From Swiss-Prot:
The lineage of its organism: Eukaryota, Metazoa, Chordata, Craniata, Vertebrata. Negatively regulates cilia formation by recruiting the CP110-CEP97 complex (a negative regulator of ciliogenesis) at the distal end of the mother centriole in ciliary cells. At the beginning of cilia formation, MPHOSPH9 undergoes TTBK2-mediated phosphorylation and degradation via the ubiquitin-proteasome system and removes itself and the CP110-CEP97 complex from the distal end of the mother centriole, which subsequently promotes cilia formation. It comes from Mus musculus (Mouse). Residues 368-729 are annotated as: Required for its centrosomal localization. The gene is Mphosph9. One of its GO terms (cellular component) is centrosome. This is M-phase phosphoprotein 9.
Amino acid sequence: MEDFDLVENLQKTSPSVESDIKSAPQSLGLSLHANRSSPHLSTNGVSSFSGKTGPPVIQGTVEVLTALRQDLQNSGRTDSELWKSCERIQEEIRKLVKLQLSHASRPSCSSSSVSEQVSAETQMGFFSENSERNESVVSSPASKEPETQPASSTSYPDCHVDSSSVSSGYGTFCILDMNTHKAKEPTEPLEPGAASQGQHPASVVQAHGPAGGAAAINFFTQTPEELCASLKEDGSTFPGEFDRNFLGENKISEVYSGKANSGKSVTSWAQRLKQNQSKQAHTEDDCSGPKPGSELNWKPPADTFDLAADAARPCAFYINKPAESPSSWLSDSGTGLTYWKLEEKDMYHSLPETLEKTFAPSPAERPLSQVLTLDPGAIRMKPKEHVAGIQAHGFLHALDDRISFSPDSVLEPSLSRHSDTDSSSQASHNPSQVSGFSKYPSTTRASPVDTWKNHAFQRESRTSSTIPSRYTITSNDISVKTVDEENTVTVASVSQSQLPGTANSVPECISLASLEDPVMLSKIRQNLKEKHARHVADLRAYYESEISSLKQKLEAKDISAVEEWKKKNEILADRCGQLDSALNEATSRVRTLEKNNNLLEIEVSDLRERFNAASSASKVLQERIEEMRTSNKEKDNTITRLKCRLQDLEEAFENAYKLSDDKEARLRQENKMFQDLLGEYESLGKEHGRVKDTLNTTENKLLDAHTQISDLKRTISKLEAQVKQAEHESMLSLRNGAKVPERPSRSNSVATSDVSRRKWLIPGAEYSIFTGQPLDPRDRKLDKQLEEALVPGYHSPPEKDSSLGSSPASLLVKKKRDTPDTPPIIKALKELDEERVFKSWGTQTEKEDSSSKLVNSRQTEPSVNTGRSPEKCAQQRPKRQTSASQRSSSLPPSSRKANTPTKREIMLTPVTVAYSPKRSPKENLSPGFSHLLSKNESSPVRFDILLDDLDTVPVSTLQQTTAKKQLQFLLDDSEEKKYSEKNSDDPVNPSSCPEHSPNGLKKVSTRQAWEKSKSVSLEQCQPGSAAPQDNGFEYTAKIRTLAETERFFDELTKEKDQIEAALSRMPSPGGRITLQTRLNQEALEDRLEKINRELGSVRMTLKKFHVLRSSANL
């Protein structure tokens, strides 16, 4: 800023009035922002040094300004800017003077009105008399140099000022000392100072000390509106400090307002001294810390304000005109000092008021033109710098960079660490109490009104500083350089010899007691007068030089301005031509662009239509694409389903093809089986024919046999009648022969013969069955002879044995031949006994045969048969005989049908067959014939012989039946063919005796027929409810049929085992088998099922006849 250009100009010693006028805006900006508590100034102050020097200086200043204006008007070559600047300066001065007068007359009764006045006056750079906080009255150098004492400092907003007055010939010299007493009463309106209205307004000064610097008395050229606006803007930044700093010192405001204090008034120098001493004691106690209610707690580390350490505070001195009234105070712009009337309590009432008035006129009589300023900062300002500093924006940035010093700074004891010979009011002080703060250390305070608010606005001074600056303070012979960057204070030089009249008259340190000396006060006044005289001379010389330089510049500017204007006009004409051509080109270009724009708009419309059509077409195509996608998806799904269906059909076709192959194979197999069945059927038909032929022949033989039997029965009946007759005759003869002695021997012989005849009926019996006594050895011999007679014919065929007399009848004939001749009656009796024996033997044998057959048929294996003990057989024999006799006797023979044998009766028909290898023929032999066999022989031939011999046994007539009824025990029509085939292989001799023809059936082998035939007859066959006939033929056929059935059972069992073994060797059903294997397996399974059914029926049949073991007989 321009303030930095002023640093080097501080060496100038020829001040002028215009420089101060031009430097007013910069000073105003600096004082507004750097220190809001600017000291109160008065526009109606007068100089108390000399009534002679003040008015001429002011008059000269105003005359210079007026002469400058007239010269500028008369010259005709007036610079417009300079002329306007002068007029503006004059107008600003008038406004500020009016504003200050209006503020002086405005009352301040409350703290709110005081704040408003302070705000308005701060913008103008001064405070009115009615401010509540008048810190400018007392200024104490509370700060020290940072290098010397880095202790903390506290602010004391509650301190007020006590004034001491010294009366002299020139007026009253006031000494204000600081104490910590608070003001008890609010301030009252100040008395407005008198000012002459008809003269030019004097320059309004401001004692400015931003952070311990010297006060600068500046002119204010801004309007009140601008000042108020800037103050409001800046006052909002530190409202707390502002109000606190101005509301805390009510005592000082009372001093300035001129209000009479209700307290004690000082009337003598001794009382004033005692009062100052008592206030110093209060300072040690009350000022050791800040007020509890104080909001300002900022403590700079390098600044200390210790009132207890200072016995005598450095005081600011104010000179008041003796002629002034106590209620008025004025500021002398010419000297930079503030003059006012002390309060009544501080005034010396003993001094006559008329005496004071004799020294100087009243303030109202003093013209404003006599006000002088001693501000070297304003003196060194150049006229051109005033115009640049008028703008309001300089207030914000130049506040902390501008510190103005007045010539009154020599009064401050803090200028130097050593003695200050120019300061005639220097009290004894500590060298460490150098005025200055951490950011803006200052060494001087020219105006006492700056020092009071110095410590209260330390932080504002620091925080508002943005540009470090260097200040060179020149007050006549004193030069002080302040370097803000280093926060140091350097006193360049203090020359006591350059201050004339003070070197020998003022000591180095002026104590408070020395200030009370009138001689010292007069010397101080004299020094001040001389100093002010020099300042006035410097100001006059400075302003004259400035005016001359401005005139020269104005003339040079007027000559060069015309040529410059011509050149500028030519340049502007050329520029206008260029602009015209450019304008034409631009218009043509604009027209072409408009045409192009129109064409482009048409194209855009066409393209828009095309785009719309294309977008609609694209939408339609997208819809079609979506439809095609959906249809394609559906088709794909259909294809997949069809593929799956095709695979299923292929698998089904393969399965059907395999099934068709299997069916064809089955058909071929079934066809083959059908052909086999046809061949078997044909063979069975042929066999059936042969069986019929055989049946016819057997029927014929049966008829012949029946006729023979009937003849024999008639013969038997005749013989029985003869026997009865013979018995009757024998009885008669016995009666008659009892008288004769020979009869007893005959009866014994007959008895022995009967016993011997009967005992052989039981096989191996050595005891008689009738008496139970041992047999006679002769009877044993007879039995042996009978056995030997039977043995030679054992191995002979039945046809040949018939001639050997194997029947009982032949035996009787042989006995008759062997015995000697006996009378006929005896013979008849013997024959009768023999017939009875044979009759009983026949029935008994028949019963035993049937019972033994049933018992032996229960056993299916030889091991079981052989394990049976003879004791059990003997025990069971009587039961069997009784059951068989009852069964045979309960059947009437006439209940049979003649020609229609049933299937149930087929199994009961006796057939001659070969015996199963599992049985011995001996088991089938009735126990009644076991005596006929040797002990070591079990050949079936003898059994056959014995069976053949049974044909000649006489049968009861009740058991006889016709030949037609006998046929029901033969084979049915289905089996006739089988037996006819076997008979053809082993034919029976047709010429054989009819009594031997039934025995020919035993030669027929039916094994092949049983293998080929089905077991239909066996399945439905059940044991007959009637017992077998007593006929020998029926018994023999029955035995042969059961034997064949047993053999068939064995064969079926063997075949079943073979089929099961074959099935087990075949692969499992889960594996893959060929068609032929499957067909074979099915055929085997079918065959196995049929065999199981046949085995079941045959097994039941054998169990019924007790051939197989049953659960009932276990």
